[in-house]
Structures are given as C-alpha cells and as structure tokens.
Regions:
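Donor-nucleotide binding loops and adjacent catalytic segments primarily
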Residues: 1-38
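Short hydrophobic alpha-helical runs that function as membrane-insertion/retention elements
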Residues: 1-4, 59-60, 81-83
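C-terminal amphipathic helix plus adjacent low-complexity
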Residues: 90-135
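Short, structured coil segments at secondary-structure junctions
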Residues: 17-19, 54, 77-78
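Class I S-adenosyl-L-methionine
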Residues: 15, 72-76, 107
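A donor-sugar binding/catalytic signature common to diverse glycosyltransferases
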Residues: 24-73
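Structured helix-beta-strand junction loops
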Residues: 35-36, 77, 116
Length: 135
C-alpha cells in the first residue's frame, strides 16, 4: 500500500488513484514511517533526518535550498537514491523496495543515530562546562 501525503492546494489535475493508494493532507512523519518499506520525498531536512533515524531507504528528489545536499548525503551513504533525468520510474521504486544494500545502510545509520547523546545530555554537558569555565 502507498500513503500519498499531498496538500489540498497541490491536487489540481490529480488523476483517480489506485485502490492501494491512500491520500492524506498531513501525517506525522514518525508515525507514517513506522513500518514503511520506503520513502519518496523532496529532500527537506525534516523528512530526510526522520527517514534516516527510522532506518527507511529513500528516493530523494533534492530540488532547491538544502535539499540537493541532503539528497547527495543520503545517496553517498547508501541509504537512498537520487532520481536521474527520467524521474520516478517503476525500476527505481523496485530498487527502493528490494535492494538489500539500501536497507542495510539505512539500518546502520539509524543505529548510529540512536547511539548519539540526546539534546538533554548535550545541554547538561554544556551547562557543566559553562559553570566550570569551559572545563
């Protein structure tokens, strides 16, 4: 099944969707990606980092702002694919869903991210250093 998150104002000209596609206005990424097999998105930092944290392979379009950099990082790390001039194809989607190396690399990055200290832990260290003149 496919969940298609698309704002109402972006639906002009949208064709009838197959029965296995559920159209939603908005859904929290953490909930959406829990149990997902793949994620296709524009490459914004929120989507990219949430997918990396969740261990989900990605197809990242990466057009505009920081999105191209995010897409390149995901692809270089082996966690995703940047579409070429042909755009999104069935071959690309099949690779996203069935390429074990994409899943393996995505799982590795998720494990690395999980090992990082939490923001609260970092804040505690910084506060201690401030109180002790940087020591």
């Amino acid at each position: 099944d496919i969940i298609l998150q698309l704002a109402i104002n972006a639906r002009t000209g949208l064709r009838k969707l197959p029965s296995n596609v559920r159209l939603v206005d908005w859904i929290p990424m953490g909930v959406f990606l829990n149990g997902a097999d793949g994620f296709i998105h524009h490459g914004g930092a929120g989507n990219t980092l949430t997918a990396l944290y969740s261990g989900i392979p990605q197809i990242v379009f990466g057009e505009g702002a920081d999105r191209s950099v995010n897409a390149e990082i995901v692809a270089k790390r082996g966690c995703g694919i940047i579409p070429d001039k042909h755009g999104l194809t069935s071959d690309l989607v099949n690779r996203l869903l069935y390429d074990d190396s994409l899943r393996f690399c995505s799982d590795q990055v998720a494990a690395e991210m999980a090992e990082q200290p939490s923001p609260a832990e970092i804040a505690e260290v910084l506060m201690r250093k401030l109180k002790n003149n940087g020591k």
